[in-house]
Amino acid sequence: MPRWEEKNLIEEGKKLGYQVATIYSKDFVLFSNDFTIDNDTDLFIQRNVSHNRALITSFLVEQVGYPVINDHTTLIRCENKIFTTYILARHNIPTPKTFIAFDKTNAIEYSKKLGYPVVIKPVEGSWGRMVAKADNLDVLYSYLEYQEFSTQKYKDIYYIQEFVNKPNRDIRIFVIGDETPVGIYRVNENNWRTNTALGAKAYPLKIDEELRELALKVKDIIGGFFLGIDIFEDKDRGYLVDEVNGVPEYKNTVRVNNFNVSKFLLEKAAEWVKK
């Protein structure tokens, strides 16, 4: 079922005079020896909730020769937290201290070196699901054991991060093309996780020059056209880039900022296609 964002994109596209069509993954078929799509389309905008479907459909559309927002390479870099963190860190983007381990012994040893509490995250996932904070060894061991016997695709790879003692909020900035038109604070008074899916409230954000430059640097490194960038505030180190979303939701951003993200995205995408 389309979310608010997809419905709004269709509505705003029609207002702008564009011909807008919705293609559902379940109806999408492409033969390997017939690289054609029976569709008079200038641009595809990827809005799959499922990462696997988003990745594969973007890839297939690209093979036919259509531009797509976002391309499959960007989606890989965004969805896989290992790719995101290590690509950004290699390019000197400030990120939370993170390590990857491939067995529990190393995960435990290096968590001690990192210092408790630590945060355990699934390699892929969104909305704060299965993200846990371990305050000590006993709690960490329980989470590692749970992951080991779970059905996660990367259950034998441990992504462990420092716990950033941020305010009870984080920052979400949207990059569209080469601009940072809007952002929000996500504030959670009842949970250290600041995802709106877990009860965080959205508030308007005034994007300063430092934030704008940081977000655009991330976009240049990760790629893509439309990104949602999650940033922590650390009292000593300043801004830390935590995650990047390649198919971002923005309903709450529109609501609190009174900013038409769909219209802005469509207009900028139309300019991009014409170049």
Swiss-Prot record:
Pfam hit, one: LysX_preATP_grasp
ATP-grasp domain residues: 85-270
Residues annotated to bind Mg(2+) 1: D230, E243
Cofactor binding comment, as recorded: Binds 2 magnesium ions per subunit.
Primary role: Catalyzes the ATP-dependent formation of a covalent bond between the amino group of alpha-aminoadipate (AAA) and the gamma-carboxyl group of the C-terminal glutamate residue in LysW.
PANTHER family found in the cross-reference section: COENZYME GAMMA-F420-2:ALPHA-L-GLUTAMATE LIGASE (PTHR21621:SF2), RIBOSOMAL PROTEIN S6 MODIFICATION PROTEIN (PTHR21621)
EC number: 6.3.2.43
One annotated Gene Ontology cellular component of this protein: cytoplasm
Subunit structure: Homodimer.
Cofactors: Mg(2+)
Pathway noted in the entry: Amino-acid biosynthesis; L-lysine biosynthesis via AAA pathway; L-lysine from L-alpha-aminoadipate (Thermus route): step 1/5
GO molecular function annotation: ATP binding; coenzyme F420-2 alpha-glutamyl ligase activity; metal ion binding
Induction (record text): Activated by LysM and repressed by lysine.
Presence of the UniProt keyword ATP-binding in the record: yes
Residue sites binding ATP per the record: 81, 121, 125-131, 161-172, 186, 195
Gene Ontology biological-process annotations: lysine biosynthetic process via aminoadipic acid; protein modification process
Organism: Saccharolobus solfataricus (strain ATCC 35092 / DSM 1617 / JCM 11322 / P2)
Positions occupied by motif N-[TS] motif that is essential for LysX substrate specificity: 252-253
Keywords, sorted A to Z: Amino-acid biosynthesis, ATP-binding, Ligase, Lysine biosynthesis, Magnesium, Metal-binding, Nucleotide-binding
Binding site for Mg(2+) 2: E243, N245
InterPro entries: ATP-grasp, ATP-grasp_RimK-type, ATP_grasp_subdomain_1, LysX/ArgX_preATP_grasp, LysX_arch, PreATP-grasp_dom_sf, Rp_bS6_RimK/Lys_biosynth_LsyX
Similarity comment text for this entry: Belongs to the RimK family. LysX subfamily.
Disulfide feature: none
Protein name (database record): Alpha-aminoadipate--LysW ligase LysX
Source organism superkingdom: Archaea
